[in-house]
C-alpha cells in the first residue's frame, strides 16, 4: 500500500499540499487578487453510492471491468469517469466522479447509459448535482498510465483576506519544484463558482514508493518548507480522505 494509515497520509498531505499565500498584502493588492479566478479545464460531479443488499464489491468490480468508455461516448465529447473506494477499509460505499471537458451537459446521458447496463441493480447513488469546476495544477507524466491509483481529497477554506489570487503564486512555486522531481504525481484544484472561499485539492498518486520518494526528494528540500508556510498562510484544510481510485478506460 502507498499509505499505511491515515496518519501517514496526513503527513504526506501536510508537506505536499497545505494551502497558502504570498505575504501580507495591502488592501489594493487584496482587492486585485480577489478578481483573479482559476482557468478551469473541466467540470466535475461527485456522487456518493452504496451497494444494494445482496451485492458485493466483487459484483461492482465485475461490472466496472466490463464497462467500456465507448459504450458511454456521445458525440466525441471528452470525459473521465473515476470510482473512489474509501481507505483503509471499505465495505459497501464508494464515490463515482465524472469529469467533463466540454461545455455540454453529459451527466444525465452517462447516468442513463449506466442504468441501462444494469448499474441500478448493483448500487444506489445520491444524484444531487453539485457542480465543481477544476483544473490540473501539475501532472508529472512519469508512469502516469495506470488506471489504478491512490487519491487524497482535501476540503479546504481560504483564511480571511486570502483567495485564489494570493494562493496561485504558492501553487506555481509548488508545481515548479514538484515537476523537477519527476515523481508520478498529479494535483487537481476544484471549486464552486458560488463559493469562492472554499476549494477541493486532490493528490493523485501513481506509484507505490511515492512516500519514500517524497521523503528523500522533497521533505528534506529547504524550498519545501517555505512553500509549506505559504500554503498554511493562505488556507486551512477541513478534512482529508484517502481512496483507492479506478479510472474507467
Regions found by a protein language model. Give the residues of each.
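Positively charged n-region of N-terminal signal peptides that target proteins for export
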Residues: 1-9
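Sec-dependent N-terminal signal peptides
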Residues: 9-19
